[in-house]
Amino acid sequence: MSIMDYELKKITIKEAAEQLNVSAVSIHNWIKDGSLQKTNNFLTQKDIDDFRNNFLNSKKLSSRANKQYKDLHNHNSLSKEIRKALKSSMSGDLISSKYESSLSESYKNKEGIYYTPQYIVEDMMKDIVDVEGKTFLDPCCGSGNFIIEAIKKGISPENVYGFDVDENAVEITKKRIKEISGYESDNIICADFLSQKSKTKNQKFDYIFTNPPWGKKINKVDRLRYSSLYNSGSSIDTSALFYFACLKMLKEDGEIGMLMPDSFFNITTFEDARKSLLTLNISRLVDYGKAFKGLMTKAVAFVATKANSQQPTANSQIQCEIYNVKKHLRSQEGFLNVPKHIFNFHIEEKENDIIRQVYSLPHITLKDNAEWALGIITGNNEKLCRKERTEGLVPIFRGKDVFKDKMAEPSLFVNENLEGCRQVADLRLYKSPNKIIYRFISNKIVCFHDTEQRYVLNSANVFVLKDDFPVSYSQLVSLLNSDFMNWLFRSVFNTHKILRGDLEMLPIFHEYFKENEVFSEETFEVYKSISL
């Protein structure tokens, strides 16, 4: 291929993302803001090379769309360093630490890879004592932290298996195994466990402990294929797919431990996985908090036993822990009665009993009883929002402008016809004579009954009640803003976002409001004691 042919070679968005080690969304953003220039309306290799060479040091890297590129590492160069280190006298543990610390945040985010801290590995595996003749698998072994701990526990290295797609990590794991045991393992395989699993379907393991990729970007066709292969239902995030794949390779009476994103335990898309987990005998649920640098998501682990001969009973107890803060026991059966089978294990049994009682009261919900609208995304607040009102501009409000009894004075203004905005819902909902505005990013419900047809940015959302809804706007706002409802919301969902799906599952006590104009804790206690 000539230099000219090389430079004019057409490059797809996917190929560009792979070359620059970023998401396709970042490529689209760079094209949209003009940072990445197309040639004749398509990308060429020269466009990519020019961007790589000229844009990396540009001041434009401070913009949100480009933050992912700022900490990009050269993986080929890093791989050469690791291969050289593997042949040296440097210990495998040191190489492992060097490799993990050299991976950029953008790479880890793209691959869904966050290497498990040693204290979490030890804590998750602390109860393993029966090791004679037992087999162990880590299907996403990384540089081998769980695998090395299994060998330290006494599991024979010949019976320890691992998969990982990262060749560097696989070779580091093999070196560490040899250093700790003298055994040169052929059981650590560089392959995608989700696809490789089908080739090892007859092999089962006594112990499977792992930290699977969280939210790794895989194409839709593969995602649906894996979902069908492992019967994962609606749970198709990579962490859930690995859970179902692992379950198929676990022996009867085998034990499984997985470190998951906290969303696994409370978000609707993981409900099928939670239902499956509740058929196992769960021994521990542990919240390790924000365990990974640069990641806001909490890391939460479960440890459970697959025992068809001894299904969970009404007496089955789970040790629930906020790591190094508190421990308490919860009935496993109790999670079956929580909306969406959410694992709200941060609360104690007596609090869950109150939740069960509350949901037994006559109630309706907002599901199918309201129309919903997301807040407006301008795509560029600095350009489209003004701090002073001029002709043709109207107020637009943020989540932080929403209070229980008022809206803050307007401080931003936008073109009345919302021209140029990236996301706009049905204007009929924004301009409804009655609607409820609520904060989106918040750990408590804060909502306001709006009668002035206000616009809101996407840090707030809105909904409009159906005409036949039996509770008035003022009554509903008094309930949703109450300390009681916020306690209930926090106890069930335990999230920093106010999601529509969660609001739709809150109980609205329509019978109570037949006798009460607004909600109050005192009158509700009387109503509850009479109704139960």
What do these predicted regions represent?
Residues 2, 35, 119-120, 141, ...:
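Signature of N6-adenine DNA methyltransferases within the class I
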Residues 2-7, 44-180, 197, 266-273, ...:
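Class I S-adenosyl-L-methionine
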Residues 6, 32-40:
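Short, solvent-exposed alpha-helical "recognition" segments
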Residues 19, 24, 29, 354-532:
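Polybasic, glycine- and aromatic-enriched phosphate-binding surface used to engage nucleic acids
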Residues 29-33, 175:
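Residue-level detection of the helix-turn-helix DNA-binding "recognition helix"
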Residues 182-193:
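Conserved SAM-binding strand-loop segment of SAM-dependent methyltransferases
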